[in-house]
Amino acid sequence: MQLNPSEISELLKSRIEGLGASTDVRTQGTVVSVTDGITRIHGLSDVMQGEMLEFPNNVFGVALNLERDSVGAVVLGDYTGVSEGDQVKTTGRILEVPVGPELKGRVVNTLGDAIDGKGPINTTQTDIIEKVAPGVIARRSVSQPLQTGIKAIDSMVPIGRGQRELIIGDRQTGKTAVAVDTIISQKGKGVTCVYVAIGQKASTINNVVRKLEEHGAMEYTIVVAAAASDSAAMQYMAAYAGCTMGEYFRDRGEDALIVYDDLTKQAWAYRQVSLLLRRPPGREAYPGDVFYLHSRLLERAARVNEEYVEKFTNGAVKGKTGSLTALPIIETQAGDVSAFVPTNVISITDGQIFLETDLFNAGVRPAINAGISVSRVGGAAQTKVIKKLSGGIRTDLAQYRELAAFAQFASDLDDATRRQLERGKRVVELLKQPQYQPLQVWELAVSLYAVNNGYLDDVDVAQILAFEKSLKDHLKAKHAALIQRIEDTKELSKDDEAELAAAVQDFKKHGAF
């Protein structure tokens, strides 16, 4: 077969023109060492801080230390398959997690992968876990209440939508119980909840999920679980992943609530990662940026204005404000609130609910110390009826605690002091509440009205809770319209107050409890 030279050149030209030369340019590095989930990598010259790195066998990591000769990275997930000499590639992406309404009702890990055995989550959107908090101009003041359904909190330490309220106390004082009751209380109120479990036993997380399912709360709740068996990196990043999932709803003009349970364990995990990365330790061996660790997380909880939401959604959502309310939990050691992490978080948040072991052991549950629990912005968000009725409660309690200390030594008390002590005992008893039974606004209003107006002064202390329950049943049966008005308007008009007074007096005459 004879080939013409001109044909050869034409053939080569057509082949070259038809060649698709697409290249995937990515920097590669080599693993130098692997210890406790921390890898040192040589050769990643253009890696970003916080960038996702791809290891062999579909394992991912995050670059945290950018040094002159090497990169310190944490491996997300199982690091046992990573060994010296492995090739590592940059991805050009910051760590992202899936977001959206599809996550509701599911239990996911730090990376947003389903771990509840209900199959994959069909979400199309992702977002980065580390985001800048909304600026000063984008925010609105806190003015709408977030009902926890807990008598002691809604009356004395009210929480508003967009607030950061710390729950602090020793182990086994009911911190998680307060948070879970608050989530259950959001049923039917249009609030999406995110529960982030950090460093807890898998069985404990399972119990919380089961309780949320029993009370129908999982349908509006996302659970992000970083169990004690997960790596330190997964535990420290779980809070940011959960926050991103909550921000999805805030930025679209909806209300969300996020619980971090707890930030003490997150600080421990971050300390472990930092020490393994050979960052210099400071007070209590924490790294120098442990304050920033929590401040950049909690500042993302905010109430944003209509302009922010409209701009974020490109005009799709107009005239709606969004909010993300945070309930961080801190565990103290022997009531020491002046330790490093507790003082940091107290200074960042808008108030704290302090739970005491002594009160818990004395049967006062929830074990809230009203004297040192405060809400710095929630007062502006309190419902009108509760604000009107709860004024005397805090004073009664404070005076009772003060007098009770002196009354131990005094044998002869005057009538005014004795009355004050008796009133205080009844207030303490009334504020007790079983777990998983959050109250509606009208129920709290009725209880506060009864104690403030002296209707409980002649009721035996042991019968207070039975009296309260029977009174509510009486009102449900005979004054349904009244309690519906209080629930709908969140106010107590003069006519309603007169009807309520008559109803309580009628119940006291004929009621059995």
Swiss-Prot record:
Alphabetical UniProt keywords: ATP synthesis, ATP-binding, Cell inner membrane, Cell membrane, CF(1), Hydrogen ion transport, Ion transport, Membrane, Nucleotide-binding, Translocase, Transport
How does the entry describe its membrane topology?
Answer: Peripheral membrane protein
Q: Main localization of the protein?
A: membrane
**Gene3D superfamilies, sorted:** 2.40.30.20, ATP synthase alpha/beta chain, C-terminal domain, P-loop containing nucleotide triphosphate hydrolases
Which compartments does it reside in?
A: Cell inner membrane
The record's top EC class is translocase
The EC number(s) attached to this protein equal 7.1.2.2
Query: InterPro entries annotated for this entry?
Result: ATP_synth_asu-like_sf, ATP_synth_asu_C, ATP_synth_asu_C_sf, ATP_synth_F1_a_nt-bd_dom, ATP_synth_F1_asu, ATPase_a/bsu_AS, ATPase_F1/V1/A1_a/bsu_N, ATPase_F1/V1/A1_a/bsu_N_sf
UniProt site (Required for activity): S373
> One Pfam family from the UniProt entry?
ATP-synt_ab_N
Reaction catalyzed = ATP + H2O + 4 H(+)(in) = ADP + phosphate + 5 H(+)(out)
A GO cellular-component term linked to this record: proton-transporting ATP synthase complex
A GO molecular function term, named singly, is: ADP binding
Residues where ATP binds = G169, D170, R171, Q172, T173, G174, K175, T176
Subunit architecture = F-type ATPases have 2 components, CF(1) - the catalytic core - and CF(0) - the membrane proton channel. CF(1) has five subunits: alpha(3), beta(3), gamma(1), delta(1), epsilon(1). CF(0) has three main subunits: a(1), b(2) and c(9-12). The alpha and beta chains form an alternating ring which encloses part of the gamma chain. CF(1) is attached to CF(0) by a central stalk formed by the gamma and epsilon chains, while a peripheral stalk is formed by the delta and b chains.
Which family is this protein grouped under? Answer: Belongs to the ATPase alpha/beta chains family.
**Main function:** Produces ATP from ADP in the presence of a proton gradient across the membrane. The alpha chain is a regulatory subunit.
What is the protein's given name?
A: ATP synthase subunit alpha
Q: Which organism is it from?
A: Bordetella pertussis (strain Tohama I / ATCC BAA-589 / NCTC 13251)
